[in-house]
Amino acid sequence: MGHTAEFIFPVDMKKIPRLDALFIRANTDPMNTTYVAARMAQMYGVPVIDDPSSIQICADKINMYMHLMKKNVSMPRTKFLKKKELDEVLAAQLFEELGMPLVLKEPSTSFSVRVEKVSSVSELLKVARRFFKLSDWIVVQEYIESRFDWRVGVINGQLLYACRYIIPSETFKIQASVNGHIVYCDVESVPADQVPPEVIELGCEAGNAIGKGMYGVDIKESNGKLYVIEVNDNPSLDGGEDAHYPDMFQKIISYLMTGDACSYADELSNKVSLSHDFEGEYGLGAATGMSNPSALTENEVCSYKIDF
C-alpha cells in the first residue's frame, strides 16, 4: 500500500505529533503510557488505534456495560453491586433474580483475571469481598453457558474478522489458571460467509456503542439468543484470528489513513477531557472511566435497566 511503519517506545513520545497515524499494540490502560500516547495523538489530531475514549470505556467494565445498555445491546442480565450493601440477604436476592450460578467481575479485569463463577451465597460473599479490596463496585451477571465464544473484530462499525474461541474443558473462561497451569482457548478463524449474519450484526452494534475504533467483541449463544459478554479495545490479532481474513491489516491501515479515521481524530480532539456523553446517575463515572456512581440510591443494587 506504499506505507511504512516504525516501532516507537515511551522515550519516543515526542514523535507522535509528526506521525501520520498511531497504531498501539501494547496492553492499554488509563494508568499506563499507552493512554498518554493515545491522548497525545488525540490532542494533535493524529488518527490513533486505540483512541483514549475507547481505552477509558473498555478498561472499566461498568463503564463499558453502561454504554452497551444505553444502546440496548443484547447482554446478560447485569447488576452493579456496591461494597457497603453486601450481605447475605442481598446475595440471596441476586441468585433469585439472576439465577444460579452467577459470574462476578472486578471492573478493571482483563485477560479473564478476577472473573469468577459462584454457586452459593457463601461463595459469592467470599469472592465479592476479595474483589471489593480493589474496587467499591463489582459486576454481577447471569451465567451464560456455551462451548465457545464468538470473537467479532470490528473497525469503524464494520467486520474486520470473526473467529471462535473454544473454551477449555477445565474452565468457563477463555484463559484461566488451573492447578497452577495456565490453560488457553483454541482459536478457530471462521470465514465471513460462514458466520451467522446476526453474530456479525450484534458485534458491529456493540462496537458502535463504544466508538468508531477497533474492537474485539465477545459473544455467546444460548437457547437461540446472542449475548455480548464484553467489548475489548486493543483486541488480539496474533492468535490466528485472521486466518481467513488476509486483508485484515490492509483494512486497518486504510482506516487509519483515510478520512474516517482523520475525522474521528478531529472529533475526539475537539472534546473536553471530561465529556458528559451520559447524563444520568452514572454520568461522570461513565464519561471518565471511573467506577464511582456515587449518586445512586443508598439501598440500590444498580439494575441493568438504568435510566439515562
Question: What would you call each of these model-derived segments?
Answer:
Residues 119-132, 137, 141-209, 221, ...:
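ATP-dependent carboxylate/phosphate-activation module, predominantly the ATP-grasp catalytic core
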